[in-house]
Amino acid sequence: MSLKEKTQSLFANAFGYPATHTIQAPGRVNLIGEHTDYNDGFVLPCAIDYQTVISCAPRDDRKVRVMAADYENQLDEFSLDAPIIAHENYQWANYVRGVVKHLQLRNNSFGGVDMVISGNVPQGAGLSSSASLEVAVGTVLQQLYHLPLDGAQIALNGQEAENQFVGCNCGIMDQLISALGKKDHALLIDCRSLGTKAVSMPKGVAVVIINSNFKRTLVGSEYNTRREQCETGARFFQQPALRDVTIEEFNAVAHELDPIVAKRVRHILTENARTVEAASALEQGDLKRMGELMAESHASMRDDFEITVPQIDTLVEIVKAVIGDKGGVRMTGGGFGGCIVALIPEELVPAVQQAVAEQYEAKTGIKETFYVCKPSQGAGQC
């Protein structure tokens, strides 16, 4: 049964009438451009065919009822006329409440709604299950009540809800790609202007995501340290962000910087340049160049930004040994575990899967999870 059928059937059973709309919003993977978002730089993600799906209908009162199919059909109810505060027990409900509250704060007027939510974006893998939920809820209200919001505004509202209501610091990339993704394309995003450019993906290329299943422990504290180091670097150059520093300016004075800060800055500057070049390489179908850029990105994350772990490096090496120069592979996400992403000709996927199955667990003692994805459409009716 599809997520659409599942949520529609649960909706009718729970609420006693049929849903009027079914909305989906996808998860995402970032192909290249790591830790560049909060430096006002460039990222190149694509939406994937794992998504959050919501069957819904408007109500003629001010009540919101939400059922979470993936959490034993837990039900949350709240009123649009009372202050919306955090739910004490259901963490999932706070993503919904936060999005609704922030839409209200933006002076959108809408009535009550019934929703049933289900999703298959793997949680905790760094594939943006939370952003896809936020964008799905925003799209539900926009569609049901014809709110004058575009995808970028729905994305910004979701980011605001996550930062301020849920209390988790995140950039804008995850929500933006979920809202604006385009089938068979990646999206080059300028994280300063929020400008986007759709970049066509070469035919016959699979987007493979492999979760190392290495439990991330350092990610929060180390992420904040990296942000501070980047801000220190920007201050040294008297610029608002590292986006505004050229590699030539950096090379001329690198020796004056604290050696660790210098390494962090070098990663951001070179990664921004790689990301812009990667968009051109993809568009021209130059998988060889894309592979080189992804390899450089991984080496930079490993040696200059120091956010990889041995398990991730091992996974990357296993995949690279199979694909050679026919594709690319690198760590994706915040670091210290999580996933790698590979762009691979479809005919090589079985060989990659076999090599990883035979070698990764033997070398690390951890079993990986393997996903083959297609670049997918952003949020909308399904």
Curated annotation (Swiss-Prot):
* Localization terms from the record: Cytoplasm
Using the UniProt record, give the first listed, main subcellular location.
cytoplasm
Q: Which positions are annotated as binding ATP?
A: 124-130
A single Gene Ontology MF term assigned here is: ATP binding
Q: Where is this site: Transition state stabilizer?
A: 28
> What pathway does the annotation place this protein in?
Carbohydrate metabolism; galactose metabolism
Q: What is its EC number?
A: 2.7.1.6
Q: Which Pfam families match?
A: GalKase_gal_bdg (PF10509), GHMP_kinases_C (PF08544), GHMP_kinases_N (PF00288)
Query: What does it catalyze?
Result: alpha-D-galactose + ATP = alpha-D-galactose 1-phosphate + ADP + H(+)
Question: Which residues, if any, are the signal sequence?
Answer: none
**UniProt KW keywords:** ATP-binding, Carbohydrate metabolism, Cytoplasm, Galactose metabolism, Kinase, Magnesium, Metal-binding, Nucleotide-binding, Transferase
Give an example GO biological process: galactose metabolic process
Which residues does Mg(2+) bind? 130, 162
Q: Which PANTHER family match?
A: GALACTOKINASE-RELATED, MEVALONATE KINASE/GALACTOKINASE
State the protein's purpose.
Catalyzes the transfer of the gamma-phosphate of ATP to D-galactose to form alpha-D-galactose-1-phosphate (Gal-1-P).
Question: What HAMAP family does the record tag this protein with?
Answer: Galactokinase (MF_00246)
Name the record gives this protein? Galactokinase
Organism lineage string: Bacteria, Pseudomonadati, Pseudomonadota, Gammaproteobacteria, Enterobacterales
Gene encoding it?
A: galK
